[in-house]
Regions:
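Position-driven detector of the extreme protein N-terminus
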Residues: 2-4
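Alpha/beta catalytic barrel-like cores
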Residues: 6, 10-147, 160, 248, ...
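Conserved, mostly hydrophobic/aromatic
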Residues: 59, 154, 193, 235, ...
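Alpha/beta enzyme core
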Residues: 68-72, 97-103, 110, 126-151, ...
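Short glycine-centered, acidic/aromatic-flanked micro-motifs in structured strand/loop junctions
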Residues: 115, 156, 195-197, 237, ...
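Conserved radical SAM core fold
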Residues: 118-122, 157-164, 198-202, 242
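Structural motif corresponding to the C-terminal cap of alpha-helices
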Residues: 145, 156-158, 162, 223
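Active-site-adjacent beta->alpha loops and helix N-cap segments on the catalytic face
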Residues: 160-171, 203-206, 281-289
Length: 356
């Protein structure tokens, strides 16, 4: 019997319980002061498209080389507490042959893993999605934990449109998020709960506020039903922003105010931290909004942090494609700059003057 087979068998034995102390410790570590999460969990297709867009021929090796370059950046661990990986990436190695999970762990960065299998059409609900991946999740989590992962992510997609989201869409996605969270915690992984209300559309910020409130309330109700240990979990929500086609865009200050208000009304105080998604915002907007939230005089019970993908990587990818031969030095510098800017936003100390 192989080690993986043994672990899979063990995971199904009765009496296995979550380690609440471990979950709470790792959840707090992920939102430790001045640090946030790098979302490097793009699917093979998405990452290939981004490579092709900057003139790099897509392949498994190209995806590995780009990410290995990011993870070799000197000093980024001061601003990055965890990295979300894709299934392909968690099985890959650095240029020197060291497993990527080992490289991250030795820097004091927790490896994480995307465990959902994508958003699919919700039957009988045109234009709406349900995220799949619960089948076999327990066994996958057992394997990922053995490979070094200590947290996981599952993304639900909520679209605003004519008559949507429906209550069926909200409930089914909230239920899936809760079941995912319970399974992850059973297997020792901190679940990052990501119900994303998309920016697509012409809706205003008040509609975004209402829909975000609805999915957050539904999700935490389902988490309670499923026995999810909230102090051992994190939330990855969207900010309250008008649809990208809306003519009435609100100020950065209003985004910060409305976002904190929405969270205060709908998120349990026991949750240790909130790690925002960037959701198509510009690099600087994502940083500025987080900075303003952390500058507010209103006290909130959670750490407010980041779990950004493109907002941390976009400039780094462009520079890597232009200077592959320079050992990725300019790419590493671009990544480190954005990481440091968001680190400053954690304490409300960022300013546009620092962007250079």
């Amino acid at each position: 019997m192989t080690m993986v087979s043994f672990l899979r068998t063990f995971s199904t034995l009765p009496g296995k319980r979550m380690d609440k102390q471990l979950l709470e410790k790792n959840a707090r570590e992920l939102v430790s002061p001045g640090r946030g999460i790098l979302a490097a969990d793009e699917s093979n297709g998405t990452m290939s498209n981004r490579l092709e867009a900057v003139g790099i021929k897509a392949s498994s090796e190209a995806r590995r080389a780009y990410r290995a370059n990011l993870f070799s950046t000197e000093g980024y661990e001061s601003a990055i507490s965890g990295v979300i990986l894709f299934d392909e990436t968690i099985r890959q190695s650095m240029d020197n042959g060291k497993p990527i999970t080992q490289e991250l762990s030795e820097r004091g960065v927790l490896p994480g893993i995307k465990v959902d299998t994508g958003a699919k059409e919700l039957a009988n609900h045109e234009g709406e999605k349900i995220t799949e991946g619960l089948d076999g999740l327990r066994e996958r989590c057992t394997e990922y934990f053995a490979m070094g992962a200590r947290f996981a992510k599952w993304r639900a997609v909520i679209r605003i449109g004519d008559g949507i989201p429906s209550s069926a869409c909200l409930y089914t996605n909230a239920h899936a998020l809760a079941r995912y969270s319970a399974i992850c915690q059973e297997q020792g992984l901190v679940p990052i709960i990501e119900p994303e209300v998309l920016m697509d559309g012409d809706h205003d910020s008040s509609v975004c506020f209402d829909v975000t409130s609805s999915i957050l309330a539904a999700t935490f109700t389902e988490c309670e039903e499923q026995g999810v240990h909230i102090p051992g979990a994190l939330l990855k929500p969207n900010m309250i922003i008008a649809g990208k086609d809306c003519e009435d865009q609100i100020s950065r200050e209003e985004v910060a105010r409305m976002t904190v208000e929405c969270l205060t009304k709908n998120v349990p105080h026991e949750l240790p931290g909130i790690v925002f998604l960037s959701g198509g915002q510009s690099d600087e907007d994502a940083t500025a909004h987080l900075n303003l939230m952390n500058k507010m005089e209103v006290e909130h019970p959670w750490q407010l942090s980041y779990s950004y993908g493109r907002a941390l990587q976009a400039d780094a990818l462009r520079k890597w494609s232009e200077n592959v031969a320079d050992s990725g030095i300019s790419s590493c510098s671009a990544f480190l700059h954005r990481a440091k800017m968001n680190s400053l936003a954690r304490s409300g100390d960022w300013s546009e003057d620092l962007e250079g």
